[in-house]
Amino acid sequence: MGVVAPLTGRLAPLGSPLSYVLRRLAPLLRQVRNGGRRHDVTVAVRDSRSDPGAARQAVRDLAGSDGANLVLTMAGTRVLPAVTDACEESGIPCVSTTFPWQAYVDARGAEPGHRFRWTYHFAWGLDDIAAVFADLWERVDDAGAVGCLWNDDLQGQLLRHDRYGFAPVTSARRHTLVDLGAYREPADGFHAQVGRLREHGAGLVTSAATATDLALFHRQARQAGLRPRLITCSRWLTYPHTHTTPAPDVHGELADACVATLVYWSPGHPYRSSLDGTTCAELAHAYRQDTGAAWLQPLGLAHALVETARHALTVAADPTDRASVAQALAGTTLDTIAGTLDWTCGPTPNIALLPLVGGQWQHGPGGPRLAVVGNSALPGVPLTGELTPAR
């Protein structure tokens, strides 16, 4: 079993959950039973160094000298597609996560409906993010149009896409989107975007910015006398404040701004591990006990990655044959600690869909906390706070 993870570089904090899960589950991964036979399993971890070129080389090493039958990966707008493309080219099965499925397909030069032979993914869609955010917008009275703070890179291009970006979902719900203008990351200022926000009287803002860029935008909007009633932001804002930015006060500032985000996993999700029955709450507690760090959303998905890999090796016609493992993944339906992963009926081939709920960064006794404030897509997830618009 091969793993490509960002152990170093700017994405390293997001590799921590996968490294932790591999350590925690090591005793359960030493062997798999398949068809009455036991097979020893070796786990080989390679560092992507948070770089697409290094990630491709990591796959080549796993496929060649390590002889991996399966590769797992997560994290990185540029790095994850590099891993999956390299696996496709090398003819090695791959399971990945933490990337909207439309971005997963588009970043690889394909269209929805395309079938990859070797690579499988589980996540949510941009349409799911739009639906969760629209649910939150509709709970804010008299907020007007939605200002879209989107960058000039892959995220912004996809969010603007006329078929699978935000517009098809939000226009059907009668929301008016106002593009505030593309910007380059990291931004050095948002005066033009703030001007458009004022011009259109938008009381809501949605974004996929880094925490640092979003805080800068909010600061400059306030300096101009503007205070959006609600800001919704995906991407980096889904992670705890201690893991996302070298400026620890940024998340306190964004909690003051009442920034809302998406939630794909939390300690309150009603799921258990297929390996040992561990609940989401137990996994989050163990992570804090063992690392001293707060739980973070990728933790549950990292665990589900490993569950999926072990399942595929257990049910494949021949776990030592890559084609058999890929075929097993294609037919997988598995209840995991991240929910039911079903690759037989996804929105497009090779995809298993995860539902989203709405969250908001709020002040807590230990600093900013991510509260679940909307659960219409998954009522089994308990609410842990009320949506609080800025005043």
Regions found by a protein language model. Name each.
Residues R117-G225:
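Extracellular/periplasmic Venus flytrap/periplasmic-binding protein
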Residues H39, L296, T314-A328:
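Short, charged, surface-exposed loops that flank catalytic or proteolytic processing sites
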Residues L62-T77, V95-T97, G147-W150, H200-A211, ...:
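Periplasmic-binding protein-like
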Residues D47, D106-D135, A182, P248-Y264:
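Short beta-strand elements at the ligand-binding edges of bilobed clamshell
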Residues T333-R391:
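Solvent-exposed, acidic/polar segments of extracytosolic/periplasmic ligand-binding ectodomains
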Residues P13-Y20, Q31-D106, A187:
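Beta-alpha junction/loop-to-helix N-cap segments that form part of ligand/metal-binding clefts
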Residues A224-H303, T384-A390:
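Extracellular/periplasmic periplasmic-binding protein-like sensory domains
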Residues G2-R23, R46-P52, Q155-G156, R272, ...:
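Extracytoplasmic "Venus flytrap"
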